[in-house]
Amino acid sequence: MSKVASIVDVLQGKVAIGETVTVRGWVRTRRDSKAGLSFLAVYDGSCFDPIQAIINNDIENYESEILRLTTGCSVIVTGKVVESPAEGQAVELQAEKVEVTGFVEDPDTYPMAAKRHSIEYLREVAHLRPRTNIIGAVARVRHCLSQAIHRFFHEQGFYWVATPLITASDTEGAGEMFRVSTLDLENLPRSENGKVDFSQDFFGKESFLTVSGQLNGETYACALSKIYTFGPTFRAENSNTTRHLAEFWMVEPEVAFATLADNAKLAEDMLKYVFRAVLAERKDDLQFFEKHVDKDVITRLENFVNSDFAQIDYTDAIDVLLKSGKKFEFPVSWGIDLSSEHERFLAEEYFKSPVVVKNYPKDIKAFYMRLNDDGKTVAAMDVLAPGIGEIIGGSQREERLEVLDKRMEEMGLNPDDYWWYRDLRKYGSVPHSGFGLGFERLIVYVTGVQNIRDVIPFPRAPRNANF
């Protein structure tokens, strides 16, 4: 019995010329020659390229099955690995046996039958779109990046912590949260004042899907020193844009005894590590993106890993923008949150490199960010990258209980709702820092794919929860 091999192993020369091997996958194309040969391009998702299988018409099921094969049919091909005389790949399979495990019922109505589909159409058939070149490449890059992130933190001595998806806390204080409830919507229990009585709900109180694992992560950082979370988060933000999802993944490290400067260094080291990994491990997919999606993909990543990060205070960044002579769609003044056009100007035109903007006005940042001595700004940072703008947001956390309480009061938050978070400041409080990286935003940057809905398997967005 021949050994089963992935197509990537065969194409990369891990199977010797002359060895008989079995590959299993799906037909991308079939073409027939007048000389009684059929050529199947078979892929299994292990790499970008398919392998070519050459089938003689003397194979027993040639007339009955091979000539019926169309795009999407599943096959098991056993054959000898031979050198390929054609350009494009070094080896091909001289088929000795082809087992058809599944035909496409009606090739004329198979959604993936056409050679080219619009990316918008593919969203409507998200259950089949992994079979396309572009979404298959995105999936492999996504896997590579996630593994590189875990590897980076493991090598740096971090512990991965699983933070809850159901929470009673609003980390961002923005109120854009999905409610979790088992109450009967047709017959809601109400208290004497007419409000919904959440004490009768499953958790005995209001609960929501988390917008961030940060607050829970901080509790473990204040015991294990260096931790990170990596999981799904949810925002009930009614934004139908190419940059927003209702469900997305976040990478959130937290480090005890770390300053804002330590935080910026960690962000730089992590980004460069994962970009080096994807350049080394997914060259085939990046070359596809470079050819068909964004010609600057590889150059952008190479420039990033070879750049020193610039750093600038928010106040100085506002000054740079005001003196730039450039007319921005959103006017610039001290106290505004930088828009994408401002961020990209700083990274692409002014610094021409990644840049860390730090020390933002307190009024535009979250309650947990450490108040600076000037009383007007907080120790917050954003990492801006050429080609996309903000890619990471983080801060040194407020470790002083009285200052934290005052910030909560200013923002209309009830300290009692955060009693456990406040406890961290009562019992051996330490300076600590962390950041959040939107994982899908990272994939957009790496692949050049413009719409964030195309870099997550099943996008969740306003009025869209199919599949």
Swiss-Prot record:
Subunit architecture: Homodimer.
SUPFAM superfamilies: Class II aaRS and biotin synthetases (SSF55681), Nucleic acid-binding proteins (SSF50249)
Keywords in alphabetical order: Aminoacyl-tRNA synthetase, ATP-binding, Cytoplasm, Ligase, Nucleotide-binding, Protein biosynthesis
GO biological process entries: asparaginyl-tRNA aminoacylation
A GO cellular component entry from the record: cytoplasm
Keyword hit for Cytoplasm: yes
InterPro entries documented for this protein: Aa-tRNA-synt_II, aa-tRNA-synth_II, aa-tRNA-synth_II/BPL/LPL, Asn-tRNA-ligase, Asp/Asn-tRNA-synth_IIb, NA-bd_OB-fold, NA-bd_OB_tRNA
Protein species of origin: Haemophilus influenzae (strain PittGG)
Protein name: Asparagine--tRNA ligase
A Pfam family reported for this protein in Swiss-Prot or TrEMBL: tRNA-synt_2
